[in-house]
Amino acid sequence: MIFLYKIFGKWDPTEVEVKDLGIKRYVSLTPVIVPHSSGKHARQQFNKSEISIVERLANNLMRTETNTGKKQVTLRAVEEAFDIVNKKTKQNPIQVLVDAIANAGPREEVVRLKYGGISVPKAVDTAPQRRVDTALRYISMGTNAAAFKSKRSVAECLATELIGAANRDTKSFSINRKDAKERVAKAAR
């Protein structure tokens, strides 16, 4: 009998399917009980794509000054958010997270080129790893913005942000940010 680890002892990452083939290599679904690698990925430049996507979400949620270094609190909030997502959608919350990342990552961005002292915006395709990083950043920024000075907990805000991003809801902060970035890139073509 082969025993597979489940994230938080509840959610099986092996049954999750990454539908966006561009980011499949950068979304790690390794089975771990507790998504906490103690920064082992920091030794090499692009090694962050080897750690669990749930841990990367928790690390991004620790961005604000009040949450810095409080990984256990953040992991508890992520676990509660996953329970809320499971109750509302009746799906594996890791699948909802992967769909949210695929939908919230911008496909096109703008860079500034200098032609004779004049800066000209130019639309470029976004690298897959940057798409995943940007999507995680937008999801965590939306969660922190919704929970700040609010009666709702971080777990509730994270659950609504994940569900909204997975459904491509324009009320979601991450989808709104992605659309704005792609709109600017479309204008700069």
Curated annotation (Swiss-Prot):
Part of the 30S ribosomal subunit. The keyword RNA-binding applies. PANTHER family: RIBOSOMAL PROTEIN S7. SUPFAM superfamilies: Ribosomal protein S7. One of the primary rRNA binding proteins, it binds directly to 16S rRNA where it nucleates assembly of the head domain of the 30S subunit. Is located at the subunit interface close to the decoding center. Disulfide bonds: none annotated. It comes from Methanosarcina acetivorans (strain ATCC 35395 / DSM 2834 / JCM 12185 / C2A). InterPro entries: Ribosomal_uS7, Ribosomal_uS7_arc, Ribosomal_uS7_dom, Ribosomal_uS7_dom_sf, Ribosomal_uS7_euk/arc. The keyword RNA-binding applies. GO terms for biological process: ribosomal small subunit assembly; translation. GO terms for cellular component: cytosolic small ribosomal subunit; ribosome. Pfam families: Ribosomal_S7. Belongs to the universal ribosomal protein uS7 family. This is Small ribosomal subunit protein uS7. GO terms for molecular function: mRNA binding; rRNA binding; structural constituent of ribosome. Keywords: Ribonucleoprotein, Ribosomal protein, RNA-binding, rRNA-binding.
